[in-house]
Amino acid sequence: NYNIGVDFEPQKSVSHSLLSDAPEDQLERSVMNFSPTVNFRYKFSKRTRLQIVYRGKGKQPNIRDLQPVTDRTNPLNIRVGNPSLKPSYMNTFTLNFNSYNTKYQRNMVATALFENTINNVTNQVTYDSETGVRTTSPVNMNGNWRAMGSFSLNTPFKNRNWIFRTYSYLQYRNQNGYTTLNKEEPVKTSVQHLTGRERLRITYRTRQMELTGLVGLTYNNSYNDVREKRTETFDYQAGTELQLYLPWGMELYNDLTYFLRTGYGYEGYAKANFMWNCQLSKAFLKRKQLLIRFKIYDILHQDISMIRTITATAIRDTDYNALGSYFMVHAILRLNMMGK
């Protein structure tokens, strides 16, 4: 079956700019946002399904970007609004396939996505090498899109005590922007970013315990066509998880993971570390509705907290102070409000 729908959302915004050295400036906009949806579902069998969805969504620029005001709060990073910005429109196509085999207890999920934005709002950056000042102004630009696919499989072996899980992910993203050096003509910049990820898990399960071994790899490849520069990073991980079912309804859980990163320019992040967490829990009450859990995080004090952000104009590594080793006590109460 299928469904077709559309949303209309009228929107009006009024902005007043009050500056000490200029008369009051008023910016008023009235628009109609248009968002269509098409949803197609096909059932091959009771447990095998396909879903295809299209969604369109209009989005208006925010007031801060539209205001014709120069923000000099940070003298080295000046921001100038653009009242000529147009609304952006995003197209999203999604495909989902799910199949479950009850005989072999095998579950398979595949997903694909394509997304592009018309009149996407991006930043035009002008850099003055003499003063070190960056001036940023929002502009409309086309050509920003991404495509993504993922696949997961969960299946037991012939010996049902063994379970195999895999997850694969691939994404390609194209980001456009403008940059200017020393007030010259703006130059269009484009960054192509490829991300690949693979996770494998094997679990051995008995009535007394569950033991899991896992490995993973994340690959990132970014290319900037202005500087003609390519960067590659590899994130490896390997670890184990152990859950023991103890007497008196208690459970002990440990997870230990080894991380190795290569290709990063920041030496503090491009190093190996271990992450070890441990928790002890017990259920109470007649139907075990109350769960008390004591968990210790980062026992070895080796956590590294860093985020890499890739845009059309820059690659930015942000390092955060990690919280360090700490513990938490959880009390979880499950209530059934629907009765028996």
Regions found by a protein language model. Name each.
Residues 1-340:
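Exposed, low-structure sequence patches enriched in small/polar residues
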